[in-house]
């Protein structure tokens, strides 16, 4: 039967086609003959198994495999012949029970019209890692490994304070009885800023009453937006003890030589990797936002958007599960809340693909390899991780998609109207 294409929506198509029976049978016979030449079945010599036995043993499975292969091949050929550009995978159903006529339903890429990226405005941020940044990172590492000793003087920023508190908000006392025990490192923001400031200078056994006004969005509902008197009693004050940056300390971070210069070089490499990721991420986000603004009027394939929304919901459910909370309380239609964000993701993804296709941008294999090495370098066994990615098609597909998107984003940035902005390392990674 001839291929029949129907429009069943602005972006949805239905394609009716058939797999030639003689071609199917020819491929099945050829595959069964290949199996017969190598089959080892009890009671028969190798290569001498009767065709009827081979058919009984393998016929059904081989026919299904060959039909699936021919289905895809025939559909791909029809799609190419009619210059169709699919947005997502096609759903294939039998057109008649048990026959060889099929119906493929799919969505197509919308028409974006002219894509002129030269009208976009891009801020190209640049930054570099300095010795000061390395010094700061070493101090952060020392803080991570710090120990505590009881302080003989009042609390300062960076000190650990163990305390008991109770609060009075009008006629309401929290807790209703007794006190709440807790601790905070002054300056860390674990407790509300006004409380932490009120603890500075206090020593073990000191008590104080702090007048605090909590913001409207404060996490404790009974205190949100209220002026509260917080009663505090200091139980203990501890000061930090930082480790010396010596050979033992350096080796504990995987620097086998234990030398300071090697340690600093390792830190520089890590910071530069972090910086590059931050700059690329910011550029991707900025260009993505501009593409969304410029092409928000273009209708997106609804099934593709819904699929993306469900994927976003699935990720959130997994995060909820990993945090120990119960994900079953999420309603079945919760994906609807992700539809707007999903539509934007689909829009940017399709535009990236469209720009790559129109301008014949090709995936850079060297860049893929560099990205793999970059990913692997963050693990204890980088070579093992590198090979794991290389041998896993799904992992490789994810890396290749990431690299291709970065190539397109850079291609756009090179042709857009640019403004240069020089930032410090800290400014770059915090934006």
From Swiss-Prot:
MF terms (GO), sorted A to Z: peptidyl-prolyl cis-trans isomerase activity; protein folding chaperone; ribosome binding
EC number from the UniProt entry: 5.2.1.8
Keyword Magnesium: no
UniProt entry keywords in alphabetical sequence: Cell cycle, Cell division, Chaperone, Cytoplasm, Isomerase, Rotamase
A GO cellular-component term linked to this record: cytoplasm
PPIase FKBP-type domain: residues covered: 158-243
Subcellular location: Cytoplasm
Source superkingdom: Bacteria
Keyword Oxidoreductase: no
Gene3D superfamilies: 3.10.50.40, Trigger factor ribosome-binding domain (3.30.70.1050), Trigger factor, C-terminal domain (1.10.3120.10)
Predominant location category: cytoplasm
UniProt GO BP: 'de novo' cotranslational protein folding; cell division; chaperone-mediated protein folding; protein transport; protein unfolding
Catalyzed chemical reaction(s): [protein]-peptidylproline (omega=180) = [protein]-peptidylproline (omega=0)
Role played: Involved in protein export. Acts as a chaperone by maintaining the newly synthesized protein in an open conformation. Functions as a peptidyl-prolyl cis-trans isomerase.
Family: Belongs to the FKBP-type PPIase family. Tig subfamily.
HAMAP family reported for this sequence: Trigger_factor_Tig
Domain-related comment: Consists of 3 domains; the N-terminus binds the ribosome, the middle domain has PPIase activity, while the C-terminus has intrinsic chaperone activity on its own.
Entry protein name: Trigger factor
